[in-house]
Amino acid sequence: MVTRQSTIILIIKLLFMSVLLNLKKVNLKYQTGKDNIRVLKDINLTTKKKETISIVGESGSGKTSLIMLIGGLEKATSGKIFFQNHEITKLSEDEVSEIRRKSIGIIFQSFYLIPNYSAVENV
């Protein structure tokens, strides 16, 4: 059972109306020494225009790893990620960074505000 204390909610807001996100059989493994730890297995996700999605799950269930993949901050071990019908899994880091800056907003449930900054400056 997922309780309030063990749940972290991550919200992805796709900022541009034309944005479409599609994940196909995405997998992510982390290498720790000689071992591979599978974090995500065969994730499929499709978003529609103007859609806001929430990812809810227990601590350690892979929510942050999924967000990092969508935001281009991690590379999938396998599978494909499409953004505006372009496969971003084949793009360079610079190209993915440009897309992220222009089109993807990520809000984590726990965040820290910088004192003396306005709400806009903290974003």
Predicted regions mapped to residue ranges:
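A short, flexible loop at the N-terminus of ABC-type nucleotide-binding domains that lies
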Residues: M17-L20, K29-D42
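The feature captures the beta-strand-to-loop junction immediately N-terminal to the Walker
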Residues: V56-E58
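Conserved Walker
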Residues: T64-S65
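Helix-to-loop junction immediately C-terminal to a conserved catalytic motif
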Residues: G71
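Conserved ABC transporter NBD signature motif
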Residues: G79-E87
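ABC ATPase NBD coupling module
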Residues: I88-G105
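Short coil-to-helix segment of the ABC ATPase nucleotide-binding domain corresponding to the Q-loop/switch region
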Residues: Y117-N122
